[in-house]
UniProtKB/Swiss-Prot annotation:
The keyword Nucleotide-binding applies. NCBIfam families: mutS1 (TIGR01070), PRK05399.1 (NF003810). Gene3D superfamilies: 1.10.1420.10, 6.10.140.430, DNA repair protein MutS, domain I (3.40.1170.10), MutS, connector domain (3.30.420.110), P-loop containing nucleotide triphosphate hydrolases (3.40.50.300). This is DNA mismatch repair protein MutS. The keyword Cytoplasm does not apply. HAMAP family: MutS. Keywords: ATP-binding, DNA damage, DNA repair, DNA-binding, Nucleotide-binding. GO terms for molecular function: ATP binding; ATP-dependent DNA damage sensor activity; damaged DNA binding; mismatched DNA binding. Belongs to the DNA mismatch repair MutS family. ATP binds at residues 646-653. This protein is involved in the repair of mismatches in DNA. It is possible that it carries out the mismatch recognition step. This protein has a weak ATPase activity.
Length: 927
């Protein structure tokens, strides 16, 4: 910030002293009805907010840049700046300017940052807004990471033994701000992912102070009560979070929920790369919303339910027991349309109880926040009724009945699930709070507390009296006038008012100069009249003139008392918010399953996987169910690694993703898009799909691909599920084949356990491993050819594809005809040696211990040398000569029968003992 070169006024001296305490924040300085910014802050704010930049100074040679915004609109402008990543310090007037002497006292009342905002304008309704803290361990490879959603009070932490995994988790949780110790240098990619780093002094990460902060915030005496005993890195990170929160909120964080250390041994681990590749939260182009898995699954009715859905998508279970509890609850709503509909209608009246409670607890709740909370509490009885009342709309069709499984606690689909029973045991209708808010607040209160008009009549006797004065003051004055007229007998007694004397009685001098009663006090003499007051009139005048201010002051006090009372109920509110979130989550999964005719999957502890008529939920939602081709897929002890081949655009990537997504959905407790499914639990889900590069870090597409693949090979366990798509692109063909081959070898060895892999490739050389390497099998996406055109059938069939049809796809994409024709000629020339090349590669790189058939002279030919021409079958020549358009249906049938006989009689045909290898190569997916 530039230093002023003029003699500063007391106001600017005060401004500069406050600015010195918040050098990294834009200081909004309250002056009357505006918040003003000066110097560099003003120039930046004017540019970002597109408001007028002016100046303020008595010295024209040293103008002070200045801009300002009205106090009543400050939240809108602050929200824009926070959304752009700026820190904002709000400096308010902390005393009444009317009663102050000299400079009005001002102080910073809050600091708003991207990771600590509470205003709805800066928050996504159904997504968390995380503040993160990372603490590296004494061992360079260790570290702890904690994250906190200030708006809800939820916070968690995790530690890792490897920095790479730690940073993967940071990128996965994507905090708006990340607190790190001074001098710590994170990976460059973190800076490119939109994560703002905030460097704090090392003292904020001190273990002793951090432990004291955390234990005090949670109200416990030992770290073991929080699962943090011996986990110093997480404790330090949590301490830094609390210190930063106290600094920005100007108070200790009393609204935090119990800390949850995330036990990864109980969760399906999905890293940030896999989330992106599966388009769980964002599409590959980075956009959210339509086209993502979350968008398909989100039938939640409340913000809390939406955020729980987000949590479960990030951290599904890997244990059968909690999954089945969710499945039972989901199915209970799935089969009962009437109950589910009633619950959805009731939940529609529930607002964001978590965030409302937080704002109220931190003294930032507006009157309208209280109304939203009141309406939410008022909806709880309707929610409860929807859960307990019997319904008659149960629909159980054979295709919707759950797969019989010993892992379920239900017998007939009607029994109340255990999870719901336990939920209802802790149900708190909060009738006392609902009645209090209902009796206290008007339905449409003003947005600002100090404006008054917040409370209903009957809530407070003194307030009612002041309201009566404010609303009926004129009537009281007229009643007093009438009483005095009657008492004094002066029928023409008048009541008047001026700014000098206030209210007065006026008596005509000519008519009543000698009849004025003794209790009249003379205030003013005029030529034709006398003006008087009385003690009663003075008292009434004082009450009338002060009633408005007294009413506003009393309402402010009453509102603060009400706020404190509701803040004291924050644990009850948070508990009910969690119950509502779970109900909403269950009904949302049931609604999605019902609308799309999904099934309940069976769960196993082995590595098997069987999916019947599986579909990709997002693709199906985009193109319509009628246009989506479902597929069966199976993995078992003999089929662990699937080599998937087929043309471009045939749907290989869709098949890969849909298998992974079905496993993910199952471990969330959701129904799955299939006719039936039995799935072995997965501990880690890995995906390497699609092309990407990172030019900012000098990383090519191939480099990024290899880095992600290396991570998968290092971190995968025997219970993981891996989907790999087109490994080895971006380099020479031989390099790509060699790398892909070696990876298949490595994964095949691990597949002797329970590791499951789907490997899509255009390197058809790899398909030779089927039958030669245990666990490896091939499948392909079928197509149909007719008159030189290809039709994508999108059907998964056994065996390898014979070619990739890349030239045909290029033609469909609009590549000019001459280029396509030339490509066909070159391809035909290359393919003459294709079979020879494939066998030569297999012979050259066969795995130790794998017995390959002995190769004859033809198989020893160079890889790209064409094979000698073979004699054509007579049927081929007949096929060339025929004119199909000239044949009648009967002639065509006769011709086909003749060809069949000729084919069977020709030596060397499949029916006459053609070699098994050639017969296998003849089986492709085109029809």
């Amino acid at each position: 910030m530039s230093e002023p070169t003029f003699k500063m006024t007391p106001m600017f001296e005060h401004y500069m002293s406050i600015k010195a305490d918040y050098p990294d924040a834009l200081l909004f300085y309250r002056m009357g009805d505006f918040y003003e910014l000066f110097f560099d802050d003003a120039e930046l704010a004017a540019r970002e907010l597109q408001i007028t930049l002016t100046s303020r100074s008595r010295d024209p040679n040293n103008p002070i840049p200045m801009c300002g915004v009205p106090w009543h609109a400050v939240d809108t402008y602050v929200a824009q700046l926070v959304d752009k990543g700026y820190h904002i310090a709000i400096c308010d007037q902390v005393e009444d300017p009317k009663t102050s002497k000299g400079l009005v006292k001002r102080a910073v009342t809050s600091v708003k940052t991207p990771g600590t905002v509470l205003d709805d304008a800066n928050l996504s309704t159904k997504s968390h807004n995380y503040l993160g803290a990372l603490c590296p361990g004494s061992d360079a490879e260790k570290g702890g990471f904690a994250w906190l959603d200030v708006s809800t009070g939820q916070w968690s932490g995790v530690d890792f033994r490897r920095q790479t995994e730690l940073w993967q988790w940071v990128l996965k949780m994507a905090p708006r701000e990340l607190l790190v110790p001074e001098g710590f240098q994170p990976p460059a990619r973190t800076l490119l992912e939109g994560i703002r780093l905030v460097r704090l002094p090392l003292s904020r990460f001190d273990l002793k102070r951090s432990t004291e902060r955390v234990l005090a915030a949670q109200g416990v005496r030992e770290a073991a009560a929080l699962g943090l005993e011996g986990r110093e890195e997480i404790m330090r990170a949590c301490g830094a979070l609390l210190a930063y929160l106290a600094q920005t909120q100007m108070r200790s964080p009393e609204h935090l929920q119990p800390f949850l250390r995330l036990d990864l041994s109980r969760r399906l681990i999905i890293d940030e790369v896999t989330e992106r590749n599966l388009e769980i939260f964002t599409r590959l182009n980075g956009r959210k919303g339509k086209g993502t898995l979350r968008h398909v699954l989100d039938e939640t009715m409340t913000p809390m339910g939406g955020r729980l859905l987000e949590d479960m998508l990030r951290h599904p279970w890997r244990e059968i027991s909690p999954i089945v509890r969710i499945q039972d609850a989901v199915e209970w709503f799935y089969v009962d349309d009437g109950r589910r509909t009633a619950l959805r209608e009731a939940l529609n009246g529930v607002y964001d109880m978590e965030r409302l409670s937080t704002r109220i607890s931190l003294n930032q709740g507006s009157p309208r926040d209280f109304i939203a909370l009141r309406n939410s509490l008022a909806a709880l009885p309707q929610v409860f009724t929807a859960l307990i009342e019997p319904t008659t709309s149960l629909l159980l069709r054979p295709d919707q009945e759950k797969d019989a499984s010993e892992n379920t606690s239900q017998e007939n689909g009607l029994t109340q699930p255990r999870a719901l029973t336990e939920l209802l045991k802790t149900w708190d209708a909060m009738e006392d709070c609902a009645q209090l808010l209902q009796s206290a607040l008007v339905d449409n209160p003003p947005p600002v507390i100090t404006d008054g008009g917040l409370f209903k009549s009957g809530y407070n006797a003194e307030l009612d009296r002041l309201l009566d004065l404010a609303e009926h003051g004129e009537q009281k004055l007229q009643a007093m006038l009438a009483e005095e007229q009657s008492t004094t007998g002066i029928a023409k007694l008048k009541l008047g008012y001026n700014r000098v004397f206030g209210y007065y009685f006026e008596v005509s001098r000519a008519a009543h100069s000698g009849t004025v009663p003794y209790h009249f006090i003379r205030r003013q003499s005029l030529a034709n009249a006398e003006r008087f007051t009385t003690e009663a009139l003075k008292n009434l005048e004082e009450e009338l003139l002060s009633a408005s201010d007294k009413r506003k002051a009393l309402e402010y006090t009453l509102f603060q008392d009400l706020r404190q009372h509701m803040a004291d109920q924050r644990e009850r509110i948070a508990h009910m918010a969690q119950l509502i979130a779970h109900l909403d989550y269950w009904q949302s999964l049931a609604q999605v399953g019902r609308l799309n005719n999904w099934c309940r999957p069976g769960l196993e502890t082995d590595g098997n996987l069987t999916i019947r008529e599986g579909r990709h939920p997002v693709v199906e939602a985009m193109i319509g169910r009628a246009n989506f081709v479902p597929n069966d897929f199976r993995l078992d002890e003999k089929r662990r690694l699937c080599l998937l081949t087929g043309p471009n655009m045939a749907g290989k990537s869709t098949v890969l993703r849909q298998v992974a997504i079905i496993c993910l959905l199952a471990q969330m407790g959701s129904m799955v898009p299939a006719t039936s499914a039995r799935l072995g639990l997965v501990d880690r889900l890995f995906s390497r799909v699609g092309a990407s590069d990172n030019l900012a870090q000098g990383q090519s597409t191939f480099m990024v691909e290899m880095m992600e693949t290396a991570r998968i090979l290092r971190q995968a366990t025997k219970r993981s599920l891996i989907i790999l798509d087109e490994i080895g692109r971006g380099t020479s063909t031989y390099d790509g084949v060699a790398l892909a081959w070696a990876m298949v070898e490595d994964l095949s060895r691990r597949a002797q356990g329970e590791l499951r892999t789907l490997f899509a490739t255009h390197y058809h050389e790899l398909t030779a491993l089927e039958g030669r390497v245990d666990g490896v099998f091939t499948m392909n996406i079928a197509i149909s050819e007719y008159s030189g055109d290809i039709l994508f059938l999108h059907k998964l069939v056994p065996g390898p594809a014979d070619r990739s049809y890349g030239v045909e796809v290029a033609r469909l994409a609009g590549v000019p005809g001459p280029v396509v024709q030339r490509a066909r000629a070159i391809l035909a020339n290359l393919e003459r040696g294709r079979d020879v090349a494939r066998k030569a590669v297999v012979s050259a790189v066969c795995l130790p211990g794998i017995d390959l058939p002995e190769t004859g002279p033809e198989e020893d030919m160079p890889v790209l040398q064409a094979a000698p021409p073979r004699s054509e079958h007579p049927v081929i020549e007949l096929l060339r000569q025929i004119e199909p358009e000239e044949l009648s249906p009967l002639d065509a049938l006769k011709t086909l029968m003749e060809w069949k006989k000729l084919w069977s009689a020709q030596p060397g045909s499949a029916e006459q003992g053609e070699s098994p290898d050639k017969h296998d190569e003849g089986k492709n997916s085109r029809g």
